[in-house]
Amino acid sequence: ADYYGMIEHMDAKIGQVLEALNVSGRADDTMVVYTADHGLAVGQHGLMGKQNMYEHSVSVPLVVRGEGVPCDRAVDALSLTYDIYPTLCNLAGIEVPESVESRSLLPLMESGEAVLHETVYSHYKDIQRMVCDGRWKLIRYYRSEGSETGTRRVQLFDLANDPWEMDDLSEREEGHAVRLQKALDEWMRAVGDPLLDA
């Protein structure tokens, strides 16, 4: 009940912001972005918080409203929170600085068919790393030497056939596990992750 109460409260507050934009006359020249940095397990997988790499915690909403944004399109594609900045620059007609490594979501918004990321990655402290290609997700767990928490294991999920991530295929789908582990290793090397050789 508390969780649904939070949703209702948030919905009301977002409504107040949108109404204030309407009253101010600025609604038509304001970009509104609704997103989150994480979800909550709320009991799924026996977890309550956000400290995991399952879809209920890492797959977050992203709704954009404003001039130049198609109002009738929903897109199911891999993206990163970092992609919001160059997207807003494009929509506002501002040049994206060369130092920005993320990608604009505008091609996805316009066609709904573009692919910006073949894979996305995430991490939690020194105990979890994740790579996902949209269908297959590999989660690698580590034992933290500092806090002496965590465990060493790998999970692999086929999100197309198991969206709730209940059937670990890491020992039955070795080809996908090896492919994704290689991609994860390359990403960890690129970002200088100290757990690469752990």
Give the location of each predicted region:
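Long, internal low-complexity/basic segments
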Residues: 3-6, 10, 80, 84, ...
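A long, amphipathic alpha-helix that forms part
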Residues: 1-30
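Conserved beta-strand positions that form and line the central face of beta-propeller blades
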Residues: 41, 53, 62, 74, ...
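Histidine-centered active-site microenvironments of extracellular/periplasmic hydrolases
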Residues: 19-70, 80, 129
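C-terminal, low-complexity/hydrophilic appendages and adjacent surface loops
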Residues: 55-57, 122-171, 176-179, 198
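Conserved hydrophobic "DFG−1" position in protein kinase catalytic cores
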Residues: 44, 64, 107, 132-133, ...
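Polar, surface-exposed loop/tail segments
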Residues: 27-30, 68, 72-131, 178-182, ...
